[in-house]
Each structure stands twice: as structure tokens, then as C-alpha cells.
Amino acid sequence: MRETDLADELFGQPGKTALPAGVRVATARQGGVTITRVEIAREGLARPRGRYVTLEVPSVSLLDERDSAVIEAAAAELRPLLPPEGPVLVLGVGNRRVTADALGPRTVQKVFVTMGPRTAPVPGIRPVAAVAPGVSAATGLSLQQLAGALVRELHPAALLCVDSLCSAEPERLGRTLQFSDTGLHPAQPDHSRHLDAARLGVPVLAAGIPTLMQAEEGRDLVVTPRDLDGVIAHGAALLGAAINRALQPKLSVAQLCWLVG
């Protein structure tokens, strides 16, 4: 099987293979969104123990932050994975200069930031900070080093990482959102990009959209959606709006879109 970051591609294929012990999969439909929840209750499987949620939507290049039904569905799945209160740091992982890898940096530009050195707490508004740390080739620091320094300085209740994902199936490209509470564990074997609670000392969540897949198993070639620019632009807006709605439930989608601009 080709590399994949999507848990439901590994465990959510009903009728193809029996589920391993300790894995539960449930699927539901909400409007035009198909939601698959994968819960892994033990270690030693293809993915770390924890909860994974994927939402299958029409191509995100056709959606944006005005699609409130999709945003509400995504926010409703992300919110239970977050701590109920406390500041959250949103980390945009990836290289903004490479389109397929730019989802994280582009998404943090859409996050409603409420923290700042001269910003007083506002009742009912959750403290949120957002940063895109760049790539190690440009900074000289690994993602783990940068994330660790930020966590030690800000003491967030949780770290939410946004990254471009890899899919094993072409029809999933630009059509799937995934959230998890297991940390950031890319399919590629670069462990300096792995972020989780054991390494950082705070809960680490991950969010993303698949933007590429291996062309052939074992070969260093990738396939991206034809409308990759649209997937990144609209996907970042959609993810940003869902993150904002999950973090700020007292504000409507319309209010949050106006505040972000």
C-alpha cells in the first residue's frame, strides 16, 4: 500500500480486512459530509493510540470559509479533541514556498489570534496564538526544537499542528479533512517532524488535508490534485474557519470570518 497519513485508509475499509484488536471504526453522514471516526485503543499498530476523525467533502477548491455547514461539521468534530479551556498554540507546519506543502503556513494566516503582549484577556474568548515556524533548511532548527521552545515560553493547554497530508487514494486528494489527538506523525520517516505529548509535555493535536500521494509504491514520485492552488487556498480558509469555530464557540462563523478579514 502507498504511504498514507489518513487513519481511515488503514482501518476504515469495511469488508476488505478484519479490524485489528483495539480498533473501532464508525461512519456517519451529516448533510453532504461523510464522517469516519477511528479510535485506536492500544499501541503497536500502524498509527499511535488515540482518536482520528476524517470528513469527506466535495473538493475543498470548491469550498471556502462561507460554507458554514461544512465548517460547523468540522468544528464539531475538532472541539471534543481539544482541552475544554486554556490557551492554544496553532502551528502551521510546512514550506510556504512549495505549494503542496503550504497548507499549514497558509492556514495560520486564517486563524483568529487573540493573544499578544498588549492584549488583555476577553471574557468568553479563548487565548489563541498562531505561528508558521518555517523549515529547518531556512531556520537551522528542527521542528521539534522550535515547537519545544514555543511551548516552554507560552505554556499552552494544547498545541494544534496543521500540515499537508499524504493519501493512498487519488480520490481523497483535496477532499478530506483529518483531525487527531495523537500528535503529528507524518508518514515519511523524518522523526524530527514528529510532535506529540511525550516529546512536548502538552496535548498535541493534528489537522490537515491530503495534497499529495505517491505515484507508485517505492518510487520517489508524487501526484498532486490538478487544482492544487485552489485546494491550498480554499483548504486553508476552510480549515482556519473550522479551527476558529472550534476554539471560539461563542462566536458565529460569520463573526469569525469578519474578525479574521
Q: Which residue stretches match the model-derived regions?
A:
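Gly/Ser/Thr-rich loops at beta-strand to alpha-helix junctions
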Residues: 93-103, 137, 164-168
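Long, charge-dense
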Residues: 106-139
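N-terminal amphipathic/basic leader segments beginning at the initiator methionine
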Residues: 1-50
